[in-house]
């Protein structure tokens, strides 16, 4: 999966099309990601007296990874991601549009 936790992504289809957000969690087995403030659902939660209050809680639900694209930090456009090796032999992700390295490490 070419999407990592902390990436800025844009939704390309569905009810949240055009929204951008940070990836909070990646679920590789299901090929899904959880994106900040995207695909919000309401869950009814029972109260547990010592831990939490009950009520209706709104939170993010997983979305298929194929429905989001990584946003390049350099050119600020959604882009496909490629891999290349640096001079010191480290494998990094790069933007296919502008050629800049996406990984911050």
Curated annotation (Swiss-Prot):
Gene name per UniProt: rplX
Coiled coil: none
Subunit: Part of the 50S ribosomal subunit.
This protein's name: Large ribosomal subunit protein uL24
Tagged with keyword Ribonucleoprotein: yes
One Gene Ontology term, aspect cellular component: ribosome
Keywords: Ribonucleoprotein, Ribosomal protein, RNA-binding, rRNA-binding
Cited Pfam families: KOW (PF00467), ribosomal_L24 (PF17136)
Organism listed in the record: Thermotoga petrophila (strain ATCC BAA-488 / DSM 13995 / JCM 10881 / RKU-1)
GO process terms (BP): translation
CDD domains linked to this entry: KOW_RPL26
InterPro entries the record matches: KOW, Rib_uL2_dom2, Ribosomal_uL24, Ribosomal_uL24_CS, Ribosomal_uL24_KOW, Translation_prot_SH3-like_sf
Classification via PROSITE patterns: RIBOSOMAL_L24
